[in-house]
Curated annotation (Swiss-Prot):
Keywords: Cytoplasm, Elongation factor, Protein biosynthesis. This is Elongation factor P. Belongs to the elongation factor P family. It is found in: Cytoplasm. The keyword Protein biosynthesis applies. It comes from Geobacillus sp. (strain WCH70). GO terms for cellular component: cytoplasm. Involved in peptide bond synthesis. Stimulates efficient translation and peptide-bond synthesis on native or reconstituted 70S ribosomes in vitro. Probably functions indirectly by altering the affinity of the ribosome for aminoacyl-tRNA, thus increasing their reactivity as acceptors for peptidyl transferase. GO terms for molecular function: translation elongation factor activity.
Length: 185
């Protein structure tokens, strides 16, 4: 059991018979009434996102998640195939279950597959990934003084805001938690 006061981003919990990952949380102490924790949770089985409010001090079960190192191989229609790095066993996950992670996955990338009581429930990405820019407007000399940004389409189809000096063909480091530009690789 874990207190909701100890919530951290990325924590996996069991609520109402489902496994949830804490995406965001906020401790709220209103002037009148009891404190509470407002949280944004993602269902690891279905991918659904739900906002849930807990009373301060309320206890929830912490889900024990096992991870296995696997390699992303390819997409087979709506299914995505991963291979265990030790046993060479292959598993398929539906696109709906790993919708958020698909924006960062490229072939032969090593990831961790999350398992709960023998059931595959999702993909755990590294904190950052390197992706190549396939489409962006060219930077114009003198643009950088304003410190603005422009959209860039990456090899996985993800579109991120990048500084003006980024060009097509550049490899970028992208934060997988929020999909933002970190730096050039």
């Amino acid at each position: 059991m874990i207190s909701v006061n100890d919530f951290r981003t990325g924590l996996t919990i069991e609520v109402d018979g489902d496994i949830w990952r804490v995406m965001d949380f906020q401790h709220v102490k209103p002037g009148k009434g009891a404190a509470f924790v407002r949280s944004k949770l993602r269902n690891l089985r279905t991918g659904a996102i739900q906002e849930k409010t807990f009373r301060a001090g309320e206890k929830v079960n912490r889900a024990q998640i096992d991870t296995r190192k696997m390699q992303y191989l390819y997409a087979n229609g709506d299914q995505h195939v991963f291979m265990d790095m030790e046993t060479y066993e292959q598993i398929e996950l539906p696109a709906k279950q790993i919708e958020h992670e698909l924006k960062f996955l490229k072939e032969n990338m090593e990831v961790y597959i999350m398992m709960y009581q023998g059931e595959t429930i999702g993909v755990e990405l590294p904190n950052t990934v390197e992706l190549k820019v396939v489409e962006t407007e060219p930077g114009i000399k003198g643009d950088t003084a304003s410190g603005g940004s422009k959209p860039a389409k990456l090899e996985t189809g993800l579109v991120v805001q990048v500084p003006f000096f980024v060009n097509e063909g550049d490899t970028l480091i992208i934060n997988t938690a929020d999909g933002t530009y970190v730096s050039r690789a």
